[in-house]
Amino acid sequence: MTVANHARPIRRALLSVSDKTGILEFAKALHAQGVELLSTGGTARLLADNGVPVIEVSDYTGHPEIMDGRVKTLHPKVHGGILARRGLDENVMAANNINAIDLVAVNLYPFADTVAKAGCTLEDAIENIDIGGPTMVRAAAKNHKDVTIVVNAADYNRVLAEMAVNNGSTTHATRFDLAIAAFEHTAGYDGMIANYFGTMVPMHRVPAHSTDECFQDSLSVEGSKFPRTFNTQLVKKQDLRYGENSHQAAAFYVDTKIDEASVATAVQLQGKALSYNNIADTDAALECVKEFSEPACVIVKHANPCGVALGKDLLDAYNRAYQTDPTSAFGGIIAFNGELDAATASAIVERQFVEVIIAPVVSQGARDVVAKKTNVRLLECGQWNTKTQTLDYKRVNGGLLVQDRDQGMVGLDDIKVVTKRQPTESELKDLMFCWKVAKFVKSNAIVYAKDGMTIGVGAGQMSRVYSAKIAGIKAADEGLEVVNSVMASDAFFPFRDGIDAAAAAGISCIIQPGGSMRDAEIIAAADEHGMAMVMTGMRHFRH
């Protein structure tokens, strides 16, 4: 029999879990198949209290748990039984009174849950660092040729089902797969611990060998939000046909610790497989539309919003968003912040070619409509309530830039009017709409908007004035009236030329962060043109 299908019978199992979900049922099923059960502490008490025959590990080894339970399973009879190579180590086992342990079911102390609690002390964290658990897990995973390791309650039934059809045995293929999961489990666990303690290392902003006087204070006695070594664990959701370009291999990994509605949580209801670019663009569209509470639609092309609008309903919002730039909307990604209905879905598929449509909920009527266009990727991401504070990553050659996700957003109470003219109520409403859109446009970003609808988007230009000019050109190309519309800039204006270009186009009001050394000149230019201007004090660069 080859290793590929070599079955190993399970006659003795060691069960020791912190998360006791399903463990009682698992133990009963193992006992019913004649498996001898070893266990520790709370797990052993749970089994015994429910009438499941179990041997305490301390009784099995002849050595009591010591040091308040810090040492329970670190014993040759335990680890020898797990690590013993069947057909090779029997003489050693017999000489040392060691019995083979064929299955290990272990999950670890809840370190992440503990340190996430308000008021968690260093001592609390230390006492929730599991020692014996990871040791047993790694031992069983190492010896997966002979031992079955289970670290996830979701795999209990899988093991039982395989035992049922293999005369109480598991196959090598299953043991190998479970061993990989075990190593992933311990790697993630140790990574969490390293990250937690790594934030206690003094902050370090520049290389220690730097002699530049301006960096003499680069070391701080305070800890850092970011650990000395950065450990994260992502799970592969799917392999992709290729990456950003066809010569690049790619895959999509997700952070399973985050449950906020996103492209990562989305379920694909129909359509071709998502591509690398589809996923990136869908993320940009969805995160933008999540900024709005009113019915909203965002159309994205190459990671930039090309049309964003509010409406009395989603159909109205889509029609208005499409109107901004029908040319760029071709082959775009469309995101909504409400339930996609049949009427809106019909308008989309009858009007344009679309790569992806995503919404928190998709009605059955909308599904039936889109089903007629089999290539359209239709995604349902679920409702979002709050946003999770996560990290953003940017790969550079030889390293990784890590920062907080940009969740900043100002309200009417946060902005400051800096010009002689005050914005009108309708202008203020459009300013806030426009500012939310600008946050998701590649820098340098300029957005023109009017009545809750973008009328021109200038994205990704090296000079801000050219982004302003492009926004005006876009509006003119679509026959959209710029006069008395508002403008948002993701960062400050370094010169007055951007203000002059906006005035020439007919812009009446501007929202921008401020902070330029020429702010006074910029404000004077706005006053000269009779424009209103507000400053947010918050920048939204996007690269």
Curated annotation (Swiss-Prot):
Enzyme Commission identifier(s): 2.1.2.3, 3.5.4.10
GO cellular component: cytosol
Catalysis performed (reactions): (6R)-10-formyltetrahydrofolate + 5-amino-1-(5-phospho-beta-D-ribosyl)imidazole-4-carboxamide = 5-formamido-1-(5-phospho-D-ribosyl)imidazole-4-carboxamide + (6S)-5,6,7,8-tetrahydrofolate; IMP + H2O = 5-formamido-1-(5-phospho-D-ribosyl)imidazole-4-carboxamide
Pathway the protein acts in: Purine metabolism; IMP biosynthesis via de novo pathway; 5-formamido-1-(5-phospho-D-ribosyl)imidazole-4-carboxamide from 5-amino-1-(5-phospho-D-ribosyl)imidazole-4-carboxamide (10-formyl THF route): step 1/1; Purine metabolism; IMP biosynthesis via de novo pathway; IMP from 5-formamido-1-(5-phospho-D-ribosyl)imidazole-4-carboxamide: step 1/1
Matches recorded under SUPFAM superfamilies: Cytidine deaminase-like, Methylglyoxal synthase-like
InterPro entries recorded: AICAR_Tfase_dup_dom_sf, Cytidine_deaminase-like, MGS-like_dom, MGS-like_dom_sf, PurH-like
MF GO annotations: IMP cyclohydrolase activity; phosphoribosylaminoimidazolecarboxamide formyltransferase activity
A biological process term (GO) from this entry: 'de novo' IMP biosynthetic process
Residues annotated as domain MGS-like: 5-151
UniProt entry keywords in alphabetical sequence: Hydrolase, Multifunctional enzyme, Purine biosynthesis, Transferase
Family, as annotated: Belongs to the PurH family.
HAMAP family in the record: PurH
Domain note: The IMP cyclohydrolase activity resides in the N-terminal region.
Protein name: Bifunctional purine biosynthesis protein PurH
Gene name for this UniProt entry: purH
